[in-house]
Design a protein with these regions (language model features):
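Oxyanion-binding and handling regions
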Residues: 1-42, 46-49, 64, 79-124
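DPxDG-like acidic metal-binding loop motif
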Residues: 53-58, 64-84
């Protein structure tokens, strides 16, 4: 089973791919993203150990949403010793699936925020 995850907006999207069958889920994560993402994945996929690869939308998008979503996805891929790939744009799902199906593994997917982060800029 391959999972495709997009946490770049307040609405999170998960696609579970098993063979040719795809199941799509979406939910409003808001401030519950970190706490609820792993639980949601477990509920929708059954056993996390059945996941054979992860594709993620790496941006651009919400700083917090991408940071939390990619942290969970990267940690899950590392702990399960499975490949992870990232992609951008409207066809990110197809691109991610293609990468996984030819055996690519980015090991760690870094977010693309679309602009420089201003996390160290002083507040006025």
């Amino acid at each position: 089973m391959i999972i495709l995850l997009d946490t770049s907006t307040a609405t999170c999207f998960l696609t579970v791919v098993e063979g040719e069958m795809k199941r799509d889920f979406e939910w409003q994560a808001g401030r519950t993203l970190a706490r609820g993402l792993l639980k949601f994945l477990e509920e929708k996929t059954g056993d996390l150990h059945d996941i054979s690869g992860i594709g993620v939308m790496k941006g651009p998008g919400s700083f917090t949403g991408l940071r939390i979503g990619l942290t969970v996805a990267n940690t899950l891929a590392d702990s399960l010793n499975i490949p992870i790939v990232g992609a951008m744009g409207e066809d990110w799902r197809e691109t991610s699936l293609g990468k996984l199906r030819v055996g690519e593994n980015e090991k760690i997917v870094m977010p693309e925020y679309g602009a420089a982060a201003h996390i160290t800029a002083p507040r006025k």
